[in-house]
A protein has these predicted regions:
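C-terminal membrane-cytosol helix-exit motif in multi-pass small-molecule transporters
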Residues: 179-198, 387-395
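Conserved MFS/SLC helix-loop-helix module at the cytosolic interface between two early adjacent transmembrane helices
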Residues: 68-101, 273
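Helix-breaking motifs and short loop linkers at transmembrane-helix boundaries and internal kinks
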Residues: 81, 102-108, 274, 295-297
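Paired small-residue
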Residues: 107-115, 289, 300-308
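Cytoplasmic helix-loop-helix junction between adjacent transmembrane helices
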Residues: 112-150
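A membrane-interface helix-boundary motif in multi-pass transporters
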Residues: 167-180, 357-382
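Structural signature of the two symmetry-related core transmembrane helices
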Residues: 84-98, 179, 277-291
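Helix-loop boundary and gating motifs at the non-cytosolic
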Residues: 17-56, 230-239
Length: 409
């Protein structure tokens, strides 16, 4: 079954094309499964005897294979139908969830994370490219922001569902429920309109096919920001439990609900006034959210921190990805998306391990468990500030040029 290709003029100026609706729905269900499982992976690792550092290693392990497959992701998005790639990679992640369901040791969990990473290495850039293929140029920032709302909705529902389901049916059946969701996404992917593969031109595995140099600066910024956010997803549940805070999964709900409000507004602002007007304030607010997390002691404080984070990372992350996509022509958006996710993968690989090491170091210096996590979250302000510096020095002018080109389209 092969879906028809999208039209050249993407439904004039409408965001909600048939293809975009399909991609939005798939993004929603895949992220629902992801967020159901992601909060359980660190918990299961702890129950299997992992230390804080090992929990960080397990959480970031998928980035190893995600990075390993990057050399073929760019060429694959050009030479193969993107909807077929989406179906196949969804199936790989489904198999990873099956591995989680039978994990009885940390090494088995690591094997599942490696398989998960192989799927994620393809999934994120392919999804981003398919979304941009079905959006008008002048509505790109708004469209990518709305596309990412699928992740926000899943963030609101997934962690709470996973944390509520696990005590009722156990880890095995919770992970298998996620696998069923991924199987449905894989089938739905075959219905997404997709352009036919581009005719061969040049070498298949050249540097240009692997990386879009135009997207290098956004990738570096995303390394710092996504890495800091990976510290949140890896440790906020454990931090809340160490403090005795019940229903800590509502942190993600608060984040997601505020993203539902902030992203459409931020997208319209970026389309009209430029990406910089969203990215810089977003990074400043994101840094402030870590200060709030470090001092959180009650559920209310965690909810406030989650809401602030939504107006920070939740706003600037899709804007930076839009900057990456708009820096190249349509045919190379898969490569640009791949480049931006190299930064994300490296952030998810490095930062949880660094964060876990900070927790362990604080513990060795006499801090209790909760104080150790508090110190770690405060430390995560540093990569956010570094990302801001990189953007100010190397990315600000490029973001302005991207906006000028899109308004002329």
């Amino acid at each position: 079954m092969t879906a028809s290709a999208p039209t050249t003029d993407v439904a004039d100026r409408s965001i909600w094309t048939r293809g975009f609706v399909y991609v939005f729905a798939i993004n929603l269900v895949i992220n629902l499964a992801q967020f159901m499982m992601n909060t359980l992976v660190p918990k299961l690792a702890v129950e299997l005897g992992a230390s804080a550092v090992v929990v960080g290693v397990v959480a970031g392990m998928f980035a190893v294979t995600a990075l390993s497959v990057r050399p073929v992701v760019g060429p694959a998005t050009v030479r193969l139908r993107r909807n077929h790639l989406l179906a196949g990679t969804s199936a790989v992640i489904m198999l990873a969830f099956v591995v989680y369901s039978v994990a009885d040791s940390v090494p088995v969990m690591m094997a599942g994370r490696l398989l998960h990473g192989a799927g994620m290495g393809f999934l994120a850039p392919v999804m981003l490219a398919l979304a941009s293929d079905n959006l008008p140029e002048r509505r790109m920032a708004s469209g990518i922001g709305i596309f990412s709302l699928g992740q926000a909705v899943a963030t609101a529902i997934g962690p709470s569902v996973g944390l509520a389901l696990q005590p009722l049916v156990g880890y095995r059946w919770t992970f298998l429920a996620g696998a069923v969701v991924l199987a449905l996404a894989s089938l739905l992917a075959l219905r997404v309109p997709s352009d036919p593969p581009a005719p061969p031109s040049g070498r298949l595995f050249s540097w240009r096919a692997f990386v879009a140099s135009e997207a290098a600066v956004p990738a570096v910024v995303l390394f710092f920001l996504a890495g800091a956010y990976a510290g949140v997803t890896s440790f906020v549940v454990l931090y809340g439990e160490a403090l005795g805070v019940r229903d800590i999964g509502l942190f993600f709900t608060a984040y997601a609900l505020c993203v539902l409000v902030s992203r459409p507004v931020a997208g319209r602002i970026a389309d009209r006034f430029g990406l910089t007007t969203v990215i810089l304030p977003g990074m400043a607010v994101f840094a402030a959210s870590f200060v709030l997390l470090a001092h959180a002691r009650t559920l209310g404080a965690f909810l406030v921190a989650g809401a602030v984070s939504a107006f920070g990372y939740g706003v600037c992350q899709p804007a930076i990805q839009t900057m990456s996509l708009m820096s190249v022509d349509k045919a190379r958006r898969g490569v640009a998306g791949n480049t931006s996710y190299i930064g994300v993968d490296l952030g998810y690989l490095v930062m949880p391990v660094v964060a876990g090491a900070v927790v362990s170091a604080a513990g060795r210096h006499g801090a209790d468990v909760a104080q150790s996590y508090s110190t770690m979250f405060l430390t995560l302000v540093v990569p956010v500030v570094l990302g801001m510096v990189v953007f100010l020095v190397r990315g600000r002018r490029r973001a302005t040029r991207v906006h000028e080109v899109s308004t002329d389209a």
